[in-house]
Structure formats: structure tokens, C-alpha cells
Swiss-Prot record:
SMART domains registered for this protein in UniProt: Knot1 (SM00505)
Disulfide topology: 33-77, 44-64, 50-71, 54-73
Organism: Arabidopsis thaliana (Mouse-ear cress)
Intracellular or extracellular location(s): Secreted
Keywords: Antimicrobial, Disulfide bond, Fungicide, Plant defense, Secreted, Signal
Signal peptide limits: 1-30
Tissue: Expressed in roots, siliques and seeds.
Family: Belongs to the DEFL family.
Keyword Secreted part of the UniProt annotation: yes
InterPro entries: Defensin_plant, Scorpion_toxin-like, Scorpion_toxin-like_sf
Protein known as: Defensin-like protein 4
Annotated gene: PDF2.1
Amino acid sequence: MKFSMRLISAVLFLVMIFVATGMGPVTVEARTCASQSQRFKGKCVSDTNCENVCHNEGFPGGDCRGFRRRCFCTRNC
């Protein structure tokens, strides 16, 4: 009887440790809104060029997207 109580206690303790490690602080990311660049001309090949144009338009970032490779500027909503 003592052995089974020790075993149950040990298993319960290990389960609690396992569950507690999965319950850390959760980070929440802001949604990202995208709009097509008004000043970018031509096919978007380089994300760096797109991002530079978007910075000039007042956006914090930008990248090339889609089949037609258009430049989209991004910001947090």
C-alpha cells in the first residue's frame, strides 16, 4: 500500500511539473495590416527595395507578395 501511494504521488508530481512548464507567459502579437504601395513601380523582385519605398511612404515595413509580385506595405493595425 505504501509503495502504491508513493508511486501515485510521484506520478502526480511529475504530471504537475510537466503541466507547469507548458504554462509560461504567453506573448500576443498585434495583427498586421497590409496595403499596396502607391509609389512602387514595376514588378516587385526585392523585399528590401519594397521595404525602402514603404519607409518613404511612412510605413514601418513592406514585402513582395502574390503571383503578380506587388509591393505591399505593412503596419500594425
